[in-house]
Amino acid sequence: LDEKEYDEYKKESKTMGTNYKERFNDSLKMQKYLRASERRANIIKNASAKLDAVKTIFKERNDMSYGLMYCNPGQIDDVRELCTNNSPNPIYVRKITEKNTPTRKERQVIMDAMIRGDYHALLAIKILDEGWDCPELRYCILMASSGNDKEYVQRRGRILRKFSGVYPNGDKKTRADIYDLCVIPDISGFSDDEVAMEVALAEKEFKRMRQISDSSENPENCDSIIKNFYKQISKSSS
């Protein structure tokens, strides 16, 4: 988080921490907790550092074809601009939002067009929550992650499905790359109640990370990254 985002995050965390223990016994405290939680979640969802991470992914991948960039509403236009301005090779995307969600028949037309090379990737909101299987995809950038275990497993599964077809260059799908962008804020200086709450919330992030690590080709590398994140938050909470 940048300085402004962190200040806002800490402010909402303080409100949540104040109402954390008593929220189940006091409806007003629960209301304050939930409102602050929603505002804070939006700070995490739209963290500017995620855009920096996307830029890094663009640089690291040699080919941006057959992909999905799963965005938050607040960042989809920013990501589209990054794609357009990607140098030396612009990334052409098909933008899909809740307002223009395609029918089942239109979905296959869109995927066929991507396979032909009409565009490199789908830039979408909630596409993985609409029962849309995407076996053709070779990579997915998850800027918007779900804290719901069932939803997350479904989203991951749609990308990892086998593709029986062949790409125009003759290649077959043998793997899929999933980039799950996680935000673990610094909690040093937080009160005991705030720390307890933050650690509990961070555990959900770590659980999701471990789920994807277990399905990866490089679980050792993933586990090492997860352990480093865990050390950071443990150090901040001590």
Describe the predicted segments one by one.
Residues 92-217:
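Conserved RecA-like P-loop NTPase helicase motor core
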Residues 1-11:
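Interdomain hinge/linker at the junction between the two RecA-like core domains of SF2 helicases
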Residues 3, 48, 73-74, 125-126, ...:
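Alpha-helix N-cap/helix-start capping motif
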Residues 9, 79-83, 131:
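Hydrophobic packing residues within well-ordered alpha-helices of enzyme cores
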Residues 2, 68-72, 142:
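Active-site-adjacent beta-strand anchor residues
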Residues 231-238:
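Non-catalytic terminal extensions of ATP-dependent helicases
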Residues 16-119:
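Conserved helicase/translocase motor-coupling segment
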Residues 218-231:
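Short, flexible loop/turn segments with low-complexity composition
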